[in-house]
């Protein structure tokens, strides 16, 4: 069994048309029955920001477990919708929330850290399904409460899952083709970087670049993803 982890951000799944395009990308990856896709999705673009804005109006403490429970719903919606589109295209697909695997985390709500992932559950499901769509950015604490990993946490979800199932490949898809010296949508003179080390991309991420979440880079460096 060859497992390809694929992570798609909010702009990639911003609407139904884009979700259909992503579904085609996933389908093209599965050229034989021995290949499986473990897809990690963010919420549709703008959804998480809208939820955060609502919370700010209510003046709710971000350390409240209910904050994480509601904030995680964006990924639940996009993952279920993607699974429906893939199933309609002829692939055997199902969506999974963090607690259904489970992705176990600490109880540091709104910025939890992953402790353990039940890879056995994922591998068992791949006996029945071609594609598993995992809601990124979330897990479950020891006291059975939904947790979130912090903004950009879906990158961390993808790398952690790739490590757990010993994936053959982990791909992070964005609306920018590659890594640039600065945001090419803002800086026209930005240059594409052909090769980059873990240390260099970690420095970029830690300095505010939105290329990858710093924790995902740390995990990738540690486990050679």
Each language-model region and where it sits:
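Nucleotide/pyrophosphate-binding catalytic subdomain
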Residues: 1-218
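Short, intrinsically disordered, charge-balanced linker/junction segments flanking boundaries
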Residues: 223-225
């Amino acid at each position: 069994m060859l497992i390809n982890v694929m992570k798609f951000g909010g702009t990639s799944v911003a609407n139904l048309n884009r979700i259909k395009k992503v579904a085609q990308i996933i389908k093209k990856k599965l050229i034989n029955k021995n290949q499986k896709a473990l897809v990690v999705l963010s919420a549709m673009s703008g959804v998480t920001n809208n939820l955060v804005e609502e919370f700010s109006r209510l003046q709710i403490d971000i350390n409240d477990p209910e904050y994480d429970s509601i904030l995680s719903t964006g990924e639940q919606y996009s993952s279920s919708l993607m699974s429906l589109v893939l199933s309609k295209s002829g692939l055997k697909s199902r969506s999974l929330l963090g607690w259904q695997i489970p992705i176990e985390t600490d109880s540091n709500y709104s910025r939890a850290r992953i402790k353990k992932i039940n890879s056995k559950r994922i591998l068992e499901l791949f006996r029945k399904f071609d594609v598993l769509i995992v809601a990124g950015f979330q897990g479950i604490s020891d006291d059975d409460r939904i947790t979130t990993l912090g903004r950009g946490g879906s990158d961390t979800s993808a790398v952690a899952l790739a490590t757990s199932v010993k994936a053959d490949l982990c791909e992070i898809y964005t609306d920018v083709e590659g890594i640039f010296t600065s945001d090419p949508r803002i800086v026209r003179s930005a240059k594409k970087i052909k090769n980059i080390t873990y240390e260099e991309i970690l420095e970029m991420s830690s300095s505010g670049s939105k290329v990858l979440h710093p924790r995902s880079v740390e995990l990738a460096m540690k486990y050679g993803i």
